[in-house]
């Protein structure tokens, strides 16, 4: 039986003719050719390129909906509100929750539907994932990042979100750092999924011999008594098939299914 992701996410509403241009300068995706009604994933960064939120944007004739897939929606709403000026021709609208569904295939598009809507025909016979199942899939996919990955110290390239980053659309919040990282290949660590039959905790260091190679971020205990999680692994150890925890625990590394490689330097 096929399964699908069905969850409600917070929406930040922006009203006004300037919503598209405003988001063009505040988020990482190039919206110049985005068709109204089509979902566009993007990121919201700090001025120094740290990831604050993963977004799904939908433009319309009256403004834009900003769905926060990962991150603090309240902090983002406050942050956007603080940088809106009269010349932007945009204003904050009402907040709401939006139901979002997506089949569990790497190339499957997402859809926004009403709370009481019948599932589209392509979901016939599909089962909604339970919360634990959904978390396991998130860890194996590497998307969306969770609170343990959104610490304020990571950038989108480290978390496999290169597809959300435009390097040629012009100036936006965090753009200078993204360009520098892409130009010199300066990604020091990358996200990896891991599995282990031994107990680990979030924040535990991972080692290659005596050398620190990474750190555990997310963790989930499965019914089989094994564990699956995410970790940030230093660049020089990305080809390692296994590392050890702080007490010698064996940890097997896997590339997350949806991880997108960071751009290579010219």
Regions picked out by a protein language model, each given a short descriptive name:
Residues 50-51, 55, 137, 159-165, ...:
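Glycine-rich, small/acidic residue-mixed loop/short-helix segments
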Residues 1-54:
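Acidic, proline/glycine-enriched N-terminal capping motif
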Residues 116-192:
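Anionic-ligand-binding alpha/beta catalytic cores of soluble enzymes and soluble regulatory domains
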Residues 18-23, 73-77, 118-124, 200-204, ...:
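Short, conserved charged micro-motifs
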Residues 2-5, 10-13, 56-144:
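Acidic, low-complexity central loop/insert segments
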Residues 24-33, 78-86, 183, 208-211:
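Short, intrinsically disordered, mixed-charge
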Residues 40-45, 103-106, 199-211:
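Short amphipathic alpha-helix segments
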């Amino acid at each position: 039986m096929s399964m699908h992701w069905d969850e409600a996410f917070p929406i930040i509403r922006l009203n006004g003719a300037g919503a598209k241009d405003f988001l063009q300068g505040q988020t990482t995706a190039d919206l110049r050719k985005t068709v109204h009604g089509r979902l566009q994933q993007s990121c919201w960064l700090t001025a120094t390129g740290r990831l604050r939120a993963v977004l799904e944007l939908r433009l319309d004739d009256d403004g834009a909906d900003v769905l926060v897939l990962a991150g603090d929606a309240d902090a983002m709403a406050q942050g956007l509100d603080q940088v809106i000026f009269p010349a932007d021709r945009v204003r904050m609208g009402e907040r709401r929750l939006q139901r979002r569904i997506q089949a569990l295939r790497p190339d499957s598009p997402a859809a926004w539907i009403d709370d009481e809507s019948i599932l589209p025909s392509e979901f016939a016979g599909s089962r909604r994932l339970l919360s634990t199942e959904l978390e396991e899939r998130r860890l194996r996919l590497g998307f969306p990042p969770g609170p343990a990955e959104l610490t304020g110290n990571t950038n989108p390239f480290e978390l496999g979100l290169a597809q959300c980053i435009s390097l040629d659309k012009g100036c936006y919040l965090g753009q200078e750092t993204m360009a520098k990282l892409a130009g010199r290949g300066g990604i020091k660590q990358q996200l990896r999924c891991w599995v282990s039959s031994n107990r680990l905790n979030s924040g535990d260091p991972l080692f290659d011999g005596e050398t620190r190679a990474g750190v555990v971020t997310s963790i989930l205990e499965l019914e089989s008594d094994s564990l699956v999680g995410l970790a940030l692994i230093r660049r020089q150890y990305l080809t390692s098939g296994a590392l050890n925890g702080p007490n010698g625990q064996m940890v097997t590394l896997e590339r997350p299914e949806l991880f997108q490689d960071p751009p290579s330097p010219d």
